[in-house]
UniProtKB/Swiss-Prot annotation:
GO terms for cellular component: cytoplasm; nucleus. The record marks C173 as: Transition state stabilizer. It is found in: Cytoplasm; Nucleus. SUPFAM superfamilies: NagB/RpiA/CoA transferase-like (SSF100950). This is Methylthioribose-1-phosphate isomerase. It comes from Aspergillus oryzae (strain ATCC 42149 / RIB 40) (Yellow koji mold). The gene is mri1. PANTHER family: METHYLTHIORIBOSE-1-PHOSPHATE ISOMERASE (PTHR43475:SF1). The active site is at D255. The lineage of its organism: Eukaryota, Fungi, Dikarya, Ascomycota, Pezizomycotina. GO terms for molecular function: S-methyl-5-thioribose-1-phosphate isomerase activity. Keywords: Amino-acid biosynthesis, Cytoplasm, Isomerase, Methionine biosynthesis, Nucleus. Gene3D superfamilies: translation initiation factor eif-2b, domain 1, Translation initiation factor eif-2b, domain 2.
Length: 381
């Protein structure tokens, strides 16, 4: 059974606290947009699609409570203002992830349309928002499954070496159920390959400095019993050079894809794309349409978030000196020289020229004969 990282029903939202994974599987209840903001900022939830869904549902949960307590304004305009301010606040929690601003923009439009309805009320406006947020949750899961199917088919038809009939795939960061509403994008492709018995083996990078690969992707792969091996980030080149291993494709997710295909994703993605090009390995980006930003023309226009130095100079994990029956004890350990300067960008930009295909819920987009992506075609009816 695929891991469920976001639980939502009847206006009640709970998420797995990813800061405690893989050691403790604990759900945290999110009641308000403020709690949602902190969960995103503190990376208790991460992954561009999941961030957008949690932000929307956090506000939906807050509105549900206000309605139940009769504390919501009956005035449609006042409720619209309340929702809009909360959405802008939520977007500030993770500016690089385009899914968050995209979802907020769509929800603002729905709210604005609701206000225009004859005899609109605050309750009606809030209800329109809640229904739209819940619909986003369901659509994200369905989109992820389509991404998985299209990606698995493309790899089987275009990436397999002549020596193997099943695919070996390397992935980076975490792009599974923990990063989306469910199933995953890049990890969803691996899941789809596994479900059709066309996966030979999966490899995942540890993804320094926050270790999303070792903490989260490895956790999901073990949970789903998918044959997989963890490597450190610096081992990727050696892995691709081993002919007997035969990595067929590298599949990653995205936090923002510019109109020309340039992709912002977890730091280290760019390096993997360069390695893939040198070794003749297919490099694929798996992303829903909500991650594609046609307004941003190239990666040069994407704002790169910088994270605290402590994420590089410390590491957090469990103590191994306790007995199996004892409660899990988490500790933070310093691993760098005190006083050293730190540069910690959360993302890098992979040029579209290094990407072989962008997997979406509408299919896999490849470059034309001039080496250009035409992502705008995806949005035409």
């Amino acid at each position: 059974m695929t891991l469920q990282a976001i639980k939502y029903s009847g206006g009640k939202l709970a998420i797995i606290d990813q800061l405690q994974l893989p050691h403790v599987e604990k759900y945290v209840t999110i009641h308000t947009s403020e709690e949602g903001w902190h969960a995103i900022k503190e990376m208790r939830v991460r992954g561009a699609p999941a961030i957008a869904i949690v932000a929307a549902l956090a506000l939906a949960s807050e509105l549900t409570t206000l309605i139940a307590r009769n504390q919501l304004s009956s005035n449609a305009i006042e409720t619209q203002t309340f929702i809009t301010e909360k959405l802008h606040y939520l977007v500030s929690s993770r500016p690089t992830a385009v899914n968050l601003s995209d979802a907020a923009g769509k929800l603002e439009t729905i709210v604005a349309e609701s206000v225009k309805m004859p005899e609109s009320t605050g309750h009606a406006v809030a209800t329109a928002f809640i229904q739209a947020a819940e619909a986003m949750l369901a659509k994200d899961v369905e989109d992820n499954r389509m991404i998985g199917e299209y990606g698995a088919k493309w790899i089987s038809e275009n990436a397999l070496s002549k020596n193997f009939t099943k695919a070996t795939v390397l992935t980076h960061c975490n792009t599974g159920s923990l990063a989306t509403a469910g199933f995953g994008t890049a990890l969803g492709v691996i899941r789809a390959l596994s479900s059709t018995d066309t996966l030979r083996h999966a490899y995942c990078t540890e993804t320094r400095p926050y270790n999303q690969g070792s903490r989260l992707t490895a956790f999901e792969l073990v949970h789903d019993r998918i044959p997989a091996t963890l490597i450190t980030d610096s081992m990727a080149a050696a892995l691709l050079a081993r002919a007997e291993i035969g990595v067929d494709a590298i599949v990653v997710g995205a936090d923002r894809v510019a109109a020309n295909g340039d992709t912002a994703n977890k730091i280290g993605t760019y390096g993997l794309a360069v390695l893939a090009k040198y070794h003749g390995v297919k490099f694929l980006v798996a992303a829903p349409l909500t991650t594609i930003d046609l307004v941003t023309k190239s990666g040069n226009e994407i704002t790169i978030e910088e994270r605290p130095a402590s994420e590089v100079t410390t590491v957090r994990g469990t103590c191994e000196d306790g007995g199996a029956s004892e409660a899990v004890k988490m500790e933070t350990v310093c691993i760098a020289a005190e006083g050293i300067n730190v540069w910690n960008p959360a993302f890098d930009i992979t040029p579209g020229a290094l990407i072989d295909g962008i997997i979406t819920e509408k299919g896999v987009v490849e470059k034309d004969s001039d080496g250009l992506f035409h992502l705008e075609e995806l949005f035409k009816a």
